[in-house]
């Protein structure tokens, strides 16, 4: 039995050294550590965020955020992909119509350093619940007509899962008059990845500055990228 323990010890030491050697040259892990550090700094500086609710996964965050809806209005998701999250939302709100926007042609431009243009393209539309309406096309092509039709309807719940700064910017540009006090917004890629400061995060804070938006944090996922908040006031519209 002693020989087996010695053998296992040698094996574990060899394995640990191999992992350490691989990690020492792993650029992706190094970039993620930098992203985690900057994310933690942001959370520490945002005193109210650190005091908000913490969730184990994005579905817990989505469920809680939906429970905080207080106004009647549009339920919208931007970035549907295979429909996992929009179906989850639809199941929680079976009596509401959910609008899902996506080109289904993949990313319109490269995102970060490892998600190239066309990533997430689907050959067929995803299967969605009966209370889901899919709006196919680029946001800048589909939103003008949609907003014209719903110009007087507020957004009650907004799920931003479009990854890119440009796409998120387009959403806020077109929906800024529909976003009101009480609107709940959940971001799927807000922080905690390399380059997060130039993505959904940046587009949101530009909207906050442009429209003089006040908001409160609802919570975030402890080991992922998701964040939820509630608009409490808009002065600049």
Tell where the protein language model's regions lie, with residue ranges.
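S-adenosylmethionine/decaboxylated-SAM
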Residues: 37-49, 63, 68-237
């Amino acid at each position: 039995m002693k020989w087996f323990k010695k053998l296992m010890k040698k094996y574990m030491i060899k394995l640990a050294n191999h992992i350490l050697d691989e990690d020492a040259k792993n650029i992706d892990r190094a970039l993620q550590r930098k992203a985690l550090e900057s994310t933690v700094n942001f959370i520490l500086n945002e005193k109210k965020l650190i005091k908000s609710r913490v969730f184990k996964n994005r579905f817990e965050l989505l469920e809680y955020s939906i429970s905080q809806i207080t106004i009647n209005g549009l339920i919208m998701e931007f970035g549907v992909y295979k429909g996992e999250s929009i179906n989850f939302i639809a199941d929680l709100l079976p009596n509401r119509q959910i609008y899902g926007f996506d080109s289904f042609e993949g990313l319109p431009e490269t995102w970060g350093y490892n998600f190239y243009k066309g990533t997430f393209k689907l050959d067929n539309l995803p299967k969605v619940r009966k209370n889901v309406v899919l709006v196919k096309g680029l946001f800048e092509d589909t939103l003008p007509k949609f907003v014209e039709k719903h110009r007087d309807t507020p957004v009650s719940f907004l799920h931003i899962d479009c990854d890119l700064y440009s796409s998120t910017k387009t959403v806020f540009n077109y929906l800024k008059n529909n976003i009101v006090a009480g609107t709940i917004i959940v971001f799927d890629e807000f922080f905690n990845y390399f380059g997060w400061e130039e993505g959904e995060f940046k587009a949101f804070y530009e909207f906050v500055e442009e429209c003089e938006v006040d908001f409160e944090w609802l919570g975030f996922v402890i080991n992922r990228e998701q964040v939820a908040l509630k608009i409490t006031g808009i002065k600049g519209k």
